[in-house]
Amino acid sequence: MNVRRNVNTPEQNSKASVDPGGREPQRWLILLAMTGSLAMIMLDTTVVAVALPTIQKNLGIDQNILEWIIIAYLVVLASFMALGGKLGDLFGKPQAFLIGTIGFGFSSLMCGLAWSGESLVGFRILQGFFAVIMQPASSAIVINSFAPGERGKAMAVYAGIPLLFMTAGPVVGGLITEYASWRYCFLLNVPIAVLVATMSVVLKPKDPKRADKKRFDWTGTGLLGTGMPCFIIAIQQASEWGWNSPLTLGLGGLGLLMLSAFVIVEFRVQDPIVSLGLFRQKVFLGDSILLFVTQASLTGVSIFVVIHLQVVMNFSPERAGIAMLPMLLPAAFMIYVAGRSYDRMGGRIPVILGGLLICTGLGLLAVGMGQRSYLIMGIGMGLVGLGVPFVQLPANTDGMSRVHATRRGMASGVLQTFRQVGSVIGLAVIGAVIAATQSAQLNSDPEIAAHADLAKSSLVDRAARGNSNALEKLRSEDPEVADSLAKVVSDGIETGMWTAAGFSSMIIFIGIFLLEGHPANDPEE
């Protein structure tokens, strides 16, 4: 008997194997629902950031509590994304997605009804827990709904439309805060969640069932659930507490100890939260490292560029937000091209191209900061925006395509964990480089050293962080100190951008040595 191998092209496979239940048109509606869920998460991130000053004034909360409105949410995302992905594999991705979506909508409602800073932080933590259940399930459902030849295109839609929502976030947040109430920044998630959840129930996405018995790794859950938050909080707060402080070292050390124990446990249990065998696949390992490095390089860019524009170049907050569009818009519009490129040639060439664009763009951004030229900075931001889709989209699509459909929730959770942890570590390292450079400037420049006592004041500290009210007050009270501060901030952030460019150069080498020149096909279980 002759056995014929399947030698169809990706395009033929797409037509032959998509949703064998005969639900071809519905996969695009499923994609729309999954895209809506991610758009909700990404819009929430930028809208809330704009509303923080108004929230602080309305609820009467101090700066420490205000910062935890953002930090608490990010800690949960970085700490529990892998667990959320595993839950989808164990109990069903559509079920996990539905629970996550309803829970995210409910917690958003409670955030909008918060009566104090502490209650808002608590509901933001709850919001984060439901996000880590919803997001890995949604991306796995997208991959499972499309055949290998169309996954890049589908993931481009899944990631591209939410990117436009994120781009519009500052404008939407500003309008809501000015003409309505900051509470609607959270409440706008509720109708989106209801619509997305309803579509999920009606469309019933397919989900391959596991043949083996499901077991829950309670020991691994406990170790991961304590180790990751300890480590992430220590890294995030190191600039505030001091890198050598007992609190930073103690909490960080405890986190690393717990995570080491987690790795040992995962090698031994029958059904781990994270199957460490995934990392024996060279390309999956490359995809994971790629997301870590990319986020480490880029997370601080938008934050520090906005500070540079306001403190050094005297941009208003509104103008500084608009000035970031050269980086955001190209990313939103090029992601479809990146998706089709992955479908045709795999990850290697798109990632190398994206790495070159990002590294060059960050270098130009640093040069533009040194020369205080927005034109050069804008070109640099544009190159970064062009490069990002060619790196992140192939890494996500390729990584999930290399595992069986029953394990894609776990794969998605692992990839997003690398991405989130990269954000935290990159921001901490680049922030430390900037702080060290600024400290050296304060101690070595005679003109600045003359104002060293003022540099330690609350007003100057808040101005250096981009606080618009503090900036205006400092410029009116002491223009000389404001000019000195601008020089310190400029030199520090320029050094930080060169550090980010150095990080991003690793993307090119990962593309050359760890990725493949063809898209991944579905593996056997």
PLM features: what roles do these ranges have?
Residues 151, 190-209, 225-236, 255-269, ...:
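C-terminal membrane-cytosol helix-exit motif in multi-pass small-molecule transporters
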Residues 159, 165-168, 377-459:
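Small-residue-rich alpha-helical segments with characteristic i,i+4
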Residues 55-56, 87-88, 172-180, 235, ...:
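Interfacial helix-cap and linker-helix signal at transmembrane-aqueous boundaries
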Residues 81-220, 246:
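Helix-loop-helix hairpins in multi-pass membrane proteins, especially solute transporters
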